[in-house]
Amino acid sequence: MAGNLVGSNIANILLVGGIMLFPISKLKIHDQDKSTFIFFLVFSIFFFFLIIFYIAIDIKFAIIFIFLLIIFFYYELKKPIDEDITLSETNDQSSLLIILKIVFSFLILFFSSRYFIEFAKSLTEIFGVAETTIGITIVAFGTSLPEVIATIISIIKKQSNLAIGNILGSNIANIFGITLIAVFLNNEINYFHLLTIIDKWLFLLTSLLFFVIVMLRLTGKILSITLILCYLTYFSYLYM
């Protein structure tokens, strides 16, 4: 779980973010969304301190996580509707149809994920590497594929703000969701010995980098290629 959480967040920012930045010339960031990015950065730093030091995340921390998550969702739902997303895009579909599509997509994702995890476990035996390494690379890359597809679709529709929200939401969900599941299944979890020092610091640095990119609205093919190359270098390093 630890490798998947950190690896997926790193992949979302370096790989998915790199793909997102390649075709666009300008990031559309609304002022109302800046507080969301600040929340992401603050919580990423808070989570970094939980994994860099020998701190057991137990039920008390889980309750705090849930409380923060409720506040986050409440604040996000109170925001005005994005003008870039017109109601005409959803008027032609009933609410029931949309719900059915979401449920069907979730079921496909759930069962495909089970097979993917089994495949990933077999790779640990084939390559003789630790499960954490597989989690940070193969499993994390697999869990980031939906973000890649969603990002490409968002860019095609010329809605870069959706692509950014996709990365942001996925990373926040990873931190909250995976940690909460681990705590409820095992009563507590300690990431200290589950991640290398490089994994921990790269998690923090990529979170800071993502914050700087969106707040300063940085774009360009050079930045895009640099992010992707950084991810490929990190990916290769873990198997050296």
Q: Which residue ranges define each predicted feature?
A:
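Hydrophobic alpha-helical segments, chiefly the membrane-spanning helices
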Residues: M1-M240
